[in-house]
Amino acid sequence: MYKMQLLCCIALTLALMANGAPTSSSTKNTKKQLEPLLLDLQLLLKEVKNYENADLSRMLTFKFYMPKQATELKHLQCLVEELKALEGVLNLGQSKNSDSANIKESMNNINVTVLELKGSETSFKCEYDDETVTAVEFLNKWITFCQSIYSTLT
């Protein structure tokens, strides 16, 4: 009696695992897409750190939201939702060392890459943490997120 239920449960588990498990080619593609995303985030962090002290301290007064638990590619939607605000802050703090064309290009690259990574799924709703973070913390956390996802794909 229980044998049949156990076999059904095992079959269902195997079916779910097979459908949810990424293939090696999709893992390879995901890794390839994560690399430029990581580089663009690092470039933006470098831009933020390039600002003169007065600009940087003013920029750090702006706060950004992070998702409560970012563990999957779908959480990149939360990055996209805060990206426009980040671009505004970076453009406010323009200095001689910074190039707005590079910032805009990085923002566009991030948007395109995130769309490719998360797919066209738009129904995901971000649950944000109550605490806000600075631009530097925001970028560092997303860099760490990408590195974490990348390391799980290896």
Curated annotation (Swiss-Prot):
The record's section on PANTHER family has: INTERLEUKIN-2
Q: Does the keyword Signal apply?
A: yes
Task: State the protein's purpose.
Answer: Cytokine produced by activated CD4-positive helper T-cells and to a lesser extend activated CD8-positive T-cells and natural killer (NK) cells that plays pivotal roles in the immune response and tolerance. Binds to a receptor complex composed of either the high-affinity trimeric IL-2R (IL2RA/CD25, IL2RB/CD122 and IL2RG/CD132) or the low-affinity dimeric IL-2R (IL2RB and IL2RG). Interaction with the receptor leads to oligomerization and conformation changes in the IL-2R subunits resulting in downstream signaling starting with phosphorylation of JAK1 and JAK3.
Instruction: Name the GO terms of the biological process aspect.
Output: activated T cell proliferation; adaptive immune response; cell surface receptor signaling pathway via STAT; extrinsic apoptotic signaling pathway in absence of ligand; interleukin-2-mediated signaling pathway; leukocyte activation involved in immune response; negative regulation of B cell apoptotic process; negative regulation of inflammatory response
Entry similarity comment: Belongs to the IL-2 family.
Would you tell me the protein name for this molecule?
A: Interleukin-2
Spell out the InterPro entries in the cross-references. Answer: 4_helix_cytokine-like_core, IL-2, IL-2_CS
Q: Which GO terms describe its molecular function?
A: cytokine activity; growth factor activity; interleukin-2 receptor binding
Which controlled-vocabulary keywords does the entry list? Adaptive immunity, Cytokine, Disulfide bond, Glycoprotein, Growth factor, Immunity, Secreted, Signal
Gene Ontology CC annotation, any one:
extracellular space
